[in-house]
Amino acid sequence: MLSSYENYAEDCYDNVSGLGSCNAFIKADIPTKIDTNASCPFGDDICKHEYGNIVFDTGYLDSHLDFGINAPPNERIQFRRVSSCAPIKTDGYRKSYRLPDSNNSYSRYYYGDSHVDYSDDLYTYEYPEINWDTQTSGQDVNAARTDYTIYQSNAFVLNGSYASYADFLPIPALRKMDADLHLMYLSSNMIGYSEEVDDPWFSAHVDKMKWYNPVNSPDAPPDTLYTQDEPVSVLACYVSEQYCNPNLPEETRCSPVGGISESAFLADGLWQNAKHQRMFRWFASIIMASGVTLDVVPGLLGDAALTARHGLQLGHSGPLPDNQWQLEVEHWHRTSLVATQAIIADTAKGISDMHLEPWLVRPNNTEEKHLCNSQKIRNAEYFNFSVFGLAFTLALGSLIIVLSYALEPILGCVQRRRSWDTYARLEWVSNETLQLQRLAHEEVGLVKWEGCAENVPVTEKGEKLAVLDLHDLEHPRLKAPPRTFAGV
């Protein structure tokens, strides 16, 4: 399912495609405030750059307006998610490790206590290093993986500390007790880039790889391809959430921000009414159970979540922009919002795979059932239209048609009665097609006419119109009608 959400985010967010499938939700996309030049959200100068980092702020999303839960203002809920990401340094947080009795070396990364019971070396991640001495001077591109590898580790906050199910306990520079921490480890392996990559997460400037382009002549020197600067680059993200009761005063309507596991509990006291509290808990349980924040996208899809792979073929990649990492994170963020939209709607629709029924959590009180029955879902088999707009268009069009037929005779009548601009009126009438024909026939001098100043002139009863004079075939003209057939 997540891959379908990813496709929807690519096709529909920012209204790029206008596809019919983009009408799946009450809102085609959820707008987000994005700061692409944010300061480092972490401490101890651990970010690769002090500025040029990224922050996503959804603002206060409304359960009615943004997620389609049809409810009066006093039953609505607001939800906000803020995500901050930055590439972080590996210098000082990385060590090389060689397996005993082996030539295989690994890079180990130390961003906290990983709770690894089987090792005294509490690293958070390790990845094999590329030994260029065994890679045939860098020309054997098949000797290592020629695709991306991405791995994720998470540290969830709960009640002012890190939850027992967190993957690791972060170092002080990465700790923030009101937001979850997610680390994304990226390796480009033996991917060769056609140009140097200055992006801080995809950074590639090592020119040890040569490639003999089959398009070039046999005597041509090999092309230089650039590979990753280090075995792994690390991207760190904070994600925090917040709920608000829009019916409370502004200074007390929102809960403190917190991680995804605790944000709903922090907001539980905002609703004193038991009915509204049950409605909030159901809504928040959907958000929390889905748990689709931006980090989940690479966590579940792996390297398929990277848009940089679109330009990858047989281990070779074209150039990447300097902000490729920001494009990747923005793509994950949008996919996570689509997933949130879809899961809220799917909760009301129910499951399509009955094999999942044993794990289905059904609404068990009146308020929860009411929320499910109040979900607005678009149906592609039907179309909505405005009756007022349609009626207004028909009425206006009919009025224009009537005026187009009635305006000329009405004005002509007024002009005749008041003797306004008689010459202009008669010239207008005389230039009509039927009046021009009347003038031509009348010049013969044999036909008597009525309505010579009207739109449609007619002959008197029994009058015959002129006929063509064909004595000069190159210059036909009108003549009086013959008295007998022989006179034609």
Please annotate each region the language model reported.
Residues M1-G18, T36, N245, S255-F385, ...:
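Solvent-exposed, extramembrane regions of membrane proteins
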Residues M1-L320, G487:
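Extracellular/lumenal ectodomains of secretory-pathway glycoproteins
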Residues N384-E408:
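Single-pass alpha-helical transmembrane segments
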